[in-house]
Amino acid sequence: LFPCAHEIHGLKSGRVEAVEVLTRYRGASGLLERVGPLLRAEGHSAQARAALDLRCLETALEALSRSRGRWDCAFVNLEPMTMEHPPFWTGIERWLRLPGLQSMRLVLELTESFSELDLEALQGHSRRLRDLGVRIAVDDLGSGVASLTHMARLAPDYIKADQSLVRLVHRRPYQAALLNALAHFARRMCVGFIAEGIETPEELQAVIDADVPWAQGYHFGEPMPMA
């Protein structure tokens, strides 16, 4: 497994303000490929998926530890169902003690399947993570899978708008208005709001015009391998 850093930009400061650590594997073509499809592939048991997700999490956190404070805030993906497995909790407590992680604002980014987890269980897991000093983000809001009800009850620290809300937003006024409404909601609730999947200057300008504070996407650069 190979950790890659994808920067998150502050649109008011013009600076890199956070990073998302993505985990890749080398496919048959020799290129680095996303692990997500493997985690959701049919035919794998829940235990096998959780074990792979834990390997990804460990890879990401160890890479952040080696980064020696390069970033103050880091996002790492987590499949919500992995929190149902006890090895996650023993692992996360151990990894949080890695050098450099204690001073970092660590955000676990719950992937779009978070709506599949029982709401009470999700809330309980989130409280336990916050007790460990870990913040919570909801990924892919607007994808049609991420439930607004679950998001509201979870009360995350960050929300990431799905790229489907960003793609061609400069040509779609209703889409731009929705991004602006979400940005206003996030500001009112003191929640960080990030638009992901920005690929063109026009999309970036539309996101800025919608008052979105943070952005991420290939327009700024591709994920880069970490040491």
Regions found by a protein language model. Give the residues of each.
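Charged helix-capping and loop-helix junction motifs
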Residues: T90-R94, A121-G124, P173-N180
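Catalytic core of bacterial c-di-GMP phosphodiesterases, primarily the EAL and HD-GYP domains
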Residues: A48-A121, G197
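A short, well-structured catalytic beta-strand-centered motif of the EAL phosphodiesterase domain
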Residues: F2-R40
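C-di-GMP signaling machinery
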Residues: L1-F2, S29, L39-R49, W89, ...
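Glycine- and small hydrophobic-enriched segments that form the cores of compact globular domains
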Residues: V19-R24, L31, R40-E42, Q47-A51, ...
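EAL-family c-di-GMP phosphodiesterase catalytic domain
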Residues: G10-R15, R24-G30, P80-T82, E109-E116, ...
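Conserved ATPase "switch" residues in P-loop NTPase domains
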Residues: R130
